[in-house]
Amino acid sequence: MVSIRLSFIFLFIMNITFSQEVNWISMDKAQELQKKVPKNIMMDVYTDWCGPCKLMDKNTFQNPDVANFLNENFYAVKFNAEGNSTLKHNGKVFSNPGYSSSNSGRNSTHNFTKYLGVYGYPTIVFFDDASNPIAPITGYLTPEQIEIYLNLFSDKKYLNIKSQEDFKVFIENFESKFKS
């Protein structure tokens, strides 16, 4: 009987560990939450047609270590670079006036995507706890690769990076804790 109970407890713990998912929210919701509990924002800028974006969803954001770190340290936002949403940021309203629901593949680029200077996908954009953009990181990132940036931008460490040499030293001293 004890072994059956232990088996159920083990399965329950394993289920919690492996079913960890990123709590994706909208940019508007993230900015609202920042007013109550300040945290940096990590935005995944993607498109529906982007193959590497889909791989990053599957291989990186489904990683339990990545999901757990994001949920604890950031407001995680998913933003369709060609979507038809409207959002407010720093007193400005952004939309996609060229959006057409009849376009089944690529669509026009959202004005917020242009404002952020994003021209390739996937791109991860980090924002500080006042919703100011810090840095965009373009390209597919593995869990081990994104961990460096999550660690750098989860607190104020990025403020100490003044040069390429500083970043190189940061990477050389970085110890990964994520599992593949």
Describe these PLM feature segments.
Residues 40, 95-102, 110-125:
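Structural micro-motif
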Residues 37-51, 76:
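Short active-site neighborhood of thiol/selenol oxidoreductases, capturing the structured segment around
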Residues 54-58, 127:
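Detector for the c-type heme attachment site
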Residues 1-21:
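Bacterial Sec-dependent N-terminal signal peptides
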Residues 20, 117, 128, 134-180:
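Non-globular targeting/processing and membrane-anchoring segments
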Residues 21-24, 63-104:
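Thiol-based oxidoreductase modules, predominantly thioredoxin-like and allied folds used
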Residues 23-41, 70:
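A short beta-strand-turn-helix
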Residues 48, 81-84, 130, 142:
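Solvent-exposed coil/turn segments that connect beta secondary-structure elements
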